[in-house]
Amino acid sequence: MTGCLKIGPGDEAPDVVNVVIEIPMNSSVKYEFDKEACIVKVDRFLYTSMVYPFNYGFIPGTLEEDGDPVDVLVISREPVAPGSLIEAVPVAVLDMEDEEGPDSKVVAVPKAKLDPLFASYKDVGDIPDALKSKIKHFFEHYKELEPGKWVRVTGWRPAADAKEIIRRAIERYKGA
């Protein structure tokens, strides 16, 4: 959970959500938010010669079934510093699983007032195939050289499913 944070998922959630960025785009360092120390720490350096294609973080005030907040990949044109908060609009879900089980990611874009470039992305079909391929390729391969780790991407789902995942995770957090 994210008990040290005094912010939640956002007043407009699940349509617009707060995302705490852990990993900036173009980074090969995997950062994670340390809930005890309330700081972003280095988790590991990627073993592959790859970088995160976009900014990556989580929605505070949410709880997935695996005990972690909802993961979010924010499609954007600039890196956002670790620990920063960005308001984002969920547009899709990337379904995947790894060595620990299901590990889907919500895919979002910055709120239009922050960056209008992606305002036309409302649903999974609005994301260009080239971007979806880039995202899928990254998640399929970024753990390849790590012993005992693997990832399999199983598909894409629409914005409505992303919002339902967020809605359930907010309720789960409130009940915890």
From Swiss-Prot:
Residues annotated for substrate binding in this entry: 30, 44, 56, 142
GO molecular function, one term: magnesium ion binding
The keyword Membrane is assigned to this record: no
Stored InterPro entries: Pyrophosphatase, Pyrophosphatase_sf
Catalytic activity: diphosphate + H2O = 2 phosphate + H(+)
Keywords: Cytoplasm, Hydrolase, Magnesium, Metal-binding
A GO cellular component annotation in the UniProt record: cytoplasm
A family per Pfam: Pyrophosphatase
Binding positions (Mg(2+) 2): 71
Disulfide bonds: none
CC cofactor: Mg(2+)
EC number annotated for this UniProt entry: 3.6.1.1
PROSITE patterns: PPASE (PS00387)
Compartments where located: Cytoplasm
Any single biological process term in GO: phosphate-containing compound metabolic process
Binding site for Mg(2+) 1: 66, 71, 103
UniProt record similarity statement: Belongs to the PPase family.
Function of the molecule: Catalyzes the hydrolysis of inorganic pyrophosphate (PPi) forming two phosphate ions.
Oligomeric form and interacting partners: Homohexamer.
UniProt-recorded name of the protein: Inorganic pyrophosphatase
Gene giving rise to this polypeptide: ppa
